[in-house]
């Protein structure tokens, strides 16, 4: 997560508690809206989408929504089309969101593909590699020897 600088300390700080709480509120509301609404965009017909995270701007007027389309056989182009479709209907979703949450301002929505699922799958694949498993076995043997001593 991108960190913001704290002008008082000169150090990096994370999002505020308010931003985190608003992001979770919007994420839950978006999940319900996407589950219940029949979106008219062609790229979004019969598609399930997971909203994994919503990051809010400090003024809570902009939200970046990280999404992962679900479904077997989706290609990179399909995913790109789905993200573009979500961005096309973002004004509609914002209107529905405004009716379902209690915030002073309903944030503008921007949808981005969440790469963390692909990264996790790649890491799992790496850990299953025989060379890596050999190294982890050696490491566990060293740790066991230290525990016995």
Curated annotation (Swiss-Prot):
Family in the record: Belongs to the RbfA family.
SUPFAM superfamilies assigned: Ribosome-binding factor A, RbfA
GO biological process, one term: maturation of SSU-rRNA
Presence of keyword Phosphoprotein: no
Protein role: One of several proteins that assist in the late maturation steps of the functional core of the 30S ribosomal subunit. Associates with free 30S ribosomal subunits (but not with 30S subunits that are part of 70S ribosomes or polysomes). Required for efficient processing of 16S rRNA. May interact with the 5'-terminal helix region of 16S rRNA.
Chief place of localization: cytoplasm
NCBIfam families for the chain: PRK00521.2-5, rbfA
A Gene Ontology molecular function term of the record: ribosomal small subunit binding
Cited PANTHER family: RIBOSOME-BINDING FACTOR A, CHLOROPLASTIC-RELATED
Any matching Pfam family: RBFA
Oligomeric and partner information: Monomer. Binds 30S ribosomal subunits, but not 50S ribosomal subunits or 70S ribosomes.
Name assigned to this protein: Ribosome-binding factor A
UniProt keyword annotation of Cytoplasm present: yes
HAMAP family: RbfA
High-level lineage: Bacteria, Pseudomonadati, Pseudomonadota, Alphaproteobacteria, Caulobacterales
Annotated localization: Cytoplasm
Organism: Caulobacter vibrioides (strain NA1000 / CB15N) (Caulobacter crescentus)
Keyword terms of this UniProt record: Cytoplasm, Ribosome biogenesis
């Amino acid at each position: 997560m991108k960190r913001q600088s704290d002008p008082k300390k000169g150090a990096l700080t994370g999002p505020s508690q308010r931003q985190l709480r608003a992001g979770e509120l919007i994420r839950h509301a978006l999940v319900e809206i996407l589950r219940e609404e029949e979106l008219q965009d062609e790229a979004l017909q019969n598609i399930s989408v997971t909203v994994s995270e919503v990051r809010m701007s400090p003024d809570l007027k902009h939200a970046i929504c990280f999404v992962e389309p679900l479904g077997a056989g989706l290609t990179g182009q399909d995913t790109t089309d789905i993200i573009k479709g979500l961005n096309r209907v973002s004004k509609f979703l914002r209107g529905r969101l405004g009716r379902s949450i209690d915030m002073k301002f309903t944030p503008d929505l921007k949808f981005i593909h969440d790469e963390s699922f692909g990264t996790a799958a790649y890491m799992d694949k790496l850990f299953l590699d025989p060379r890596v498993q050999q190294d982890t076995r050696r490491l566990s043997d060293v740790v066991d020897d230290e525990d016995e001593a």
